[in-house]
């Protein structure tokens, strides 16, 4: 059967649809990040407790993706993704009317379940429909949508909460996400290479175990766990740094700091093309080095250097995620949706775990403690990427370009 090639009209429709989907997912997910300081003040909770407004969502997102990834092998890709996006948008609107922090946490928890239907399947859809030589570019554009959504959600919610309130901020994100959901459903064509299977829990369980026993796949899962964990820890607590002395920025100005995440748009697309040309291993190692350098730059007290560090960190993060996620789609020969779901389970579990643990380092050691935790995590990720790079040089019947 014919796979979709870069430059064709259907390739452009698919990448536009997934760009909108990535935008939607990350705008909803991260719109609470600049609001955490306001949650701390309005609901009288600690910064660690306020971080749960993101952590509970990502944890349920991680767990639910294992279910949706398996169900999509039976029910198909597009229907689950479309329903998921619509439900998440409605729940975002409902969250805007939360009368208490507990209500907000309950709605954000349910939202995590709803959001899971898209990212758990997106990589499998792209891996099935896009030709291998164009997959890196397609995945890069999808993750570019993630970057824009993350920037948009953070900046818009921060600005609106400064001049109006956080209820209006989340309500606005909910309305915009509904529009993005419609764009996605209209533009995405049905799967052409998907073959439905009967739901056999025993076989699904064995397939999950098989993916986990694959050392190279498991290394990629752990890299995703560490990458997003470090990213969320940095952005959860950098807000407290910027709002406090010696900077004492107002919330509106500090929200604009998130504009540096726009480099993720260029990084994921650019790195996707680099992968198509040079293979996965070298590009993954390069990106993790960039993330480490960016984290260390944020220790400097000069605001300009700190912002440069955030920009470098973001460039490397989105590039590294683009490489690791598309590598999983190439490495898994069977049950690709399950493999993608496992990667994203670890990815978002890292967000939940380290997004909250970072609060303990913040409380005990302030920003230097948070950066120390992040640096240690990234050194482990670098070691894992080095293992993957070395494994490519060994004979491997699955080896194509880099590591299949």
Swiss-Prot record:
The record's listing under CDD domains reads: MFS_NepI_like (cd17324)
| Membrane topology, record value | Multi-pass membrane protein
Q: Does the keyword RNA-binding apply?
A: no
State any single GO MF term: transmembrane transporter activity
Q: Does the keyword section mention Endoplasmic reticulum? A: no
Q: Where in the cell is it found?
A: Cell membrane
**Regions crossing the membrane:** 16-36, 49-69, 79-99, 110-130, 133-153, 166-186, 221-241, 252-272, 283-303, 307-327, 342-362, 364-384
The cross-references to InterPro entries, in alphabetical order and at most eight, read:
MFS (IPR011701), MFS_dom (IPR020846), MFS_trans_sf (IPR036259)
Superkingdom of origin organism? Bacteria
Q: Cite the entry's keywords alphabetically.
A: Cell membrane, Membrane, Transmembrane, Transmembrane helix, Transport
- Name a single GO cellular component: plasma membrane
Q: What is its main location?
A: membrane
Q: Which PANTHER family match?
A: BLL2771 PROTEIN, INNER MEMBRANE TRANSPORT PROTEIN YNFM
Hey, which family's this protein in? Answer: Belongs to the major facilitator superfamily.
Listed name of the protein: Uncharacterized MFS-type transporter YybF
Q: Provide the species name.
A: Bacillus subtilis (strain 168)
From the UniProt record, report the name of the gene that encodes this protein: yybF
């Amino acid at each position: 059967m014919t796979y979709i090639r870069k430059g064709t009209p259907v390739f452009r429709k698919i990448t536009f649809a997934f760009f909108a989907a990535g935008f939607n997912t990350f705008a909803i997910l991260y719109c609470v990040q600049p609001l955490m300081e306001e949650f701390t003040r309005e609901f009288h909770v600690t910064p660690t407790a306020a971080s749960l407004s993101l952590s509970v969502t990502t944890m349920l997102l991680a767990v639910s993706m294992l279910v949706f990834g398996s169900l999509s092998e039976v029910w198909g890709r597009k229907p689950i993704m479309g329903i998921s996006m619509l439900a998440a948008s409605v729940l975002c609107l409902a969250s805007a009317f939360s009368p208490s922090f507990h209500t907000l946490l309950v709605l954000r928890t349910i939202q995590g379940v709803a959001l899971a239907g898209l990212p758990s399947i997106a990589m499998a859809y792209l891996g099935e429909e896009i030709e291998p030589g164009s997959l890196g570019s397609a995945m890069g554009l999808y993750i570019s949508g993630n970057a824009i959504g993350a920037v948009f959600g953070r900046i818009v919610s921060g600005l609106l909460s400064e001049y109006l309130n956080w209820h209006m901020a989340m309500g606005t994100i909910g309305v915009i996400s509904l529009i993005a959901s419609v764009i996605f459903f209209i533009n995405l064509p049905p799967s052409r290479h998907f073959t439905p299977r009967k739901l056999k829990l025993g076989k699904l369980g064995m397939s999950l175990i098989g993916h986990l026993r694959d050392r190279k796949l498991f290394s990629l899962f752990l890299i995703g766990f560490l990458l997003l964990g470090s990213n969320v820890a940095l952005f959860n607590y950098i807000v407290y740094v910027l709002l406090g002395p010696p900077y004492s920025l107002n919330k509106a100005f500090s929200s604009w700091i998130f504009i540096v995440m726009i480099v993720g748009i260029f990084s994921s697309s650019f790195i996707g093309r680099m992968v198509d040309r040079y293979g996965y291993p070298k590009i993954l190692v390069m990106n993790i080095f960039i993330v480490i350098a960016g984290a260390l730059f944020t220790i400097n007290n000069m605001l300009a250097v700190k912002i440069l560090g955030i920009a470098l960190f973001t460039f490397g993060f989105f590039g590294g995620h683009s490489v690791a996620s598309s590598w999983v789609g190439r490495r898994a020969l069977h049950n690709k949706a399950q493999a993608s779901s496992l990667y994203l389970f670890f990815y978002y579990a890292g967000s939940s775990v380290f997004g909250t643990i970072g609060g303990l380092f913040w409380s005990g050691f302030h920003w230097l403690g948070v950066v120390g935790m992040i640096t240690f995590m990234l050194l482990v990720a670098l070691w894992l990427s080095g293992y993957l790079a070395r494994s490519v040089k060994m004979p491997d019947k699955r080896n194509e370009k880099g590591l299949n």
